[in-house]
Amino acid sequence: VIVGGGFGGLKLANKLKKSGFQVVLIDKNNYHQFPPLIYQVASAGMEPTSISFPFRKIFQHRKDFYFRMAEVRAVFPEKNMIQTSIGKAEYDYLVLAAGTTTNFFGNKHIEEEAMPMKNVSEAMGLRNALLANLERAVTCSNKQEQQELLNIVVVGGGATGVEVAGVLSEMKKFVLPNDYPD
């Protein structure tokens, strides 16, 4: 059983292709998403379907592969069993490759106000918020409120933060003058 269909889970599932093992992949989504391009979804540069690939399609010709869309609720190593949102699953070997969570480093304000971007759903939330703020700013008569709507803070200097900052800069320079001339 492999829990998590990110890069690690997919790599292992592919490595086990001719191993003789029956592979069960469990993920909360029924698709693999390509994290390096999530920022493109957030900036409306790409659609979610361009970076999302259904597990069943990826492994459709594998006879020893099974996919279950579920979330793991508990692990019972002494019983070689996991409890998921759709029931129990037994295993000979268990690999936990469920990915990461956003680290706010104890900053409660950022944790409460920030919009993390670890998946397509969060990227779409960010995209919708950006576009809604742009539309509201166009019709806003209060200059201070308009400035607040257009003020964007990128927290984090990792790959995602740098990519988001870069694409926002490109949008400001090339997209916004054409799409929002007023």
Residue ranges and their predicted role:
Residues 1-66, 152-153, 159-182:
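Beta1-alpha1 glycine-rich phosphate/pyrophosphate-binding loop at the start
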Residues 66-153, 171, 176:
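FAD-binding core/adjacent interface of flavoenzyme oxidoreductases
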